[in-house]
Every structure is written in structure tokens, then in C-alpha cells.
């Protein structure tokens, strides 16, 4: 069994597709098909076998999943999370990060005072957006760039941004 700390979420099954047990897979890799090059596991560390059938215009993958052969079986997989072992991932270049490593990091202001946490990282096609949950429980979306986040470490990020009062 693998600890979730040793796993990186690389995809999730969105829905079933067709009557033959195919599933629609949302891959978090870039490009989306890179997920197929990894040894994939579930939360318990059991191997997952995925075979690509096709890819739609949104980049979602239509796949076979393990031995699922019918739509009824595939319907139960909605929301199923797919992981790979952290150790199997390539080394990152400077200023590259895995989403899993940034999510929940403390956000500090320029005076190194904690003002919130990274709640989520989103991408709608025009670049990464950081969702910050501030200490007062409000959230804001900010572009993920050096102007807003000049310092990023494995333990915290510094935010260069003045919130409106």
C-alpha cells in the first residue's frame, strides 16, 4: 500500500462513454496522453490498466479501463481518481512545480506573515490560476506568475498583492 504522499493525482474518470464500458478520462498531464506512459495506480496502490480509444476536442481521453466491459460497470467509476508514483515522475526544471506540491501551501505576504493557503490551481486554457483562501475565509483567483508570486518554496509562497479593503 502506498501513502497518498507518495502518489500524484494524474487523472480522474469523468463519466462513462458509449455502451462498451469505455470511460471519459480527464488527464492532468501535459499533453493529456502522457498519462498513458505512466504506471498508474489507485489510492491503494493497485495497478490500473488503461488503453486509449480516442481523444476528444477538449483533450479528454476515451479509454478502456481495467476489465470493464459494460456501460453499467463503467457508470460506477465516475469520480475515480488515478495516480502515479511520485518517484516515477521526471525531475523538474527550476520554477516548475507539481500541482500536488503547491496545493495547501501557506501563502505569506511580503512581511512573511501567513495570510492564507493555496486552495486550488485551475487552468481554463490561458494559463494557471491560483485560488487562494485567505485567513478570513474569502477566496480570490490570481494569475500564477512571478509578478504575483515572486518567491515559491516547497514550504510556502510569497504573495505580492494588496487586497482591497
Swiss-Prot record:
Gene Ontology BP annotations: ribosomal small subunit biogenesis; rRNA processing
Q: What does this protein do?
A: An accessory protein needed during the final step in the assembly of 30S ribosomal subunit, possibly for assembly of the head region. Essential for efficient processing of 16S rRNA. May be needed both before and after RbfA during the maturation of 16S rRNA. It has affinity for free ribosomal 30S subunits but not for 70S ribosomes.
Q: Which GO terms describe its molecular function?
A: ribosome binding
Key words, A-Z: Chaperone, Cytoplasm, Ribosome biogenesis, rRNA processing
Q: Quaternary arrangement and interactors, per the entry?
A: Binds ribosomal protein uS19.
Entry annotated with the keyword Chaperone:
yes
**What positions does the domain PRC barrel occupy?**
94-165
Instruction: Please tell me one Gene Ontology term that the record gives under cellular component.
Output: cytoplasm
Pfam families the record matches: PRC, RimM
Name of the molecule in the record: Ribosome maturation factor RimM
Amino acid at each position: 500500500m502506498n501513502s497518498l504522499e507518495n502518489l500524484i493525482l494524474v487523472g480522474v474518470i469523468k463519466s462513462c462513454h458509449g455502451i462498451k464500458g469505455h470511460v471519459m478520462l480527464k488527464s492532468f498531464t501535459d499533453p493529456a496522453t502522457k498519462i498513458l506512459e505512466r504506471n498508474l495506480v489507485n489510492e491503494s496502490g493497485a495497478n490500473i490498466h488503461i488503453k486509449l480509444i480516442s481523444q476528444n476536442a477538449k483533450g479528454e481521453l476515451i479509454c478502456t479501463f481495467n476489465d470493464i466491459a459494460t456501460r453499467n460497470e463503467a457508470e460506477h467509476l465516475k469520480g475515480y481518481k488515478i495516480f502515479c508514483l511520485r518517484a516515477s515522475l521526471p525531475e523538474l526544471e527550476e520554477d516548475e512545480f507539481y500541482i500536488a506540491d503547491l496545493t495547501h501551501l501557506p501563502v505569506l505576504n511580503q512581511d512573511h506573515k501567513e495570510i492564507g493557503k493555496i486552495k486550488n490551481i485551475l487552468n481554463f486554457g490561458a494559463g494557471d490560476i491560483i485560488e487562494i483562501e485567505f485567513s478570513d475565509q474569502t477566496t480570490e483567483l490570481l494569475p500564477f506568475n512571478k509578478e504575483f508570486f515572486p518567491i515559491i518554496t516547497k514550504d510556502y509562497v510569497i504573495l505580492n498583492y494588496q487586497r482591497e479593503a
